Amino acid sequence: MAKHRSNRLAETLKQEISQLIREELKDPRIGFVTVTSVEVADDLGNAKVYVSVLGDSQQAKDSLDALKRAAGFVRSEIGKRVRLRHAPEIVFKYDTSIEHGAHIAQLLRGVKQEEEKDEGESHDQ
């Protein structure tokens, strides 16, 4: 039961935090940020918010720093928007899964090109 509740809360937090970042946070360092997932502890006291940032590594670092500074504001707004006895402590983390997936796709394309090149050379002989 607790796991089901934390999963529901995680989805709600994902939606609310996404909206907060889009509409309420006015820090110019925050670039194009996407909340990819939220993990809520079983006791509902902590929430890890995973974000991806469109841009280079410096833009990602700046955006993450700005989000970490705004975590208290985000928590207080969540407390107002979501019916909870205590709003969870918010921790922002950079999600590398998109970059990792792009890297794997690039490697697979390279392998496919090598195979096609090898097949072309074997047909020529």
Curated annotation (Swiss-Prot):
GO biological process terms held by the UniProt record: maturation of SSU-rRNA
Record's keyword annotation contains Transmembrane: no
Location(s) in or outside the cell: Cytoplasm
Keyword Cytoplasm in record: yes
Keyword terms: Cytoplasm, Ribosome biogenesis
A molecular function (GO) term: ribosomal small subunit binding
Main location: cytoplasm
Gene3D superfamilies named among the record's database cross-references: 3.30.300.20
Domain of life where this protein originates: Bacteria
This protein's GO CC annotations: cytosol
Signal peptide residue numbers: none
Pfam families membership: RBFA
Role summary: One of several proteins that assist in the late maturation steps of the functional core of the 30S ribosomal subunit. Associates with free 30S ribosomal subunits (but not with 30S subunits that are part of 70S ribosomes or polysomes). Required for efficient processing of 16S rRNA. May interact with the 5'-terminal helix region of 16S rRNA.
Subunit structure: Monomer. Binds 30S ribosomal subunits, but not 50S ribosomal subunits or 70S ribosomes.
Family per record: Belongs to the RbfA family.
The protein, known as: Ribosome-binding factor A
Higher taxonomy: Bacteria, Bacillati, Bacillota, Clostridia, Eubacteriales
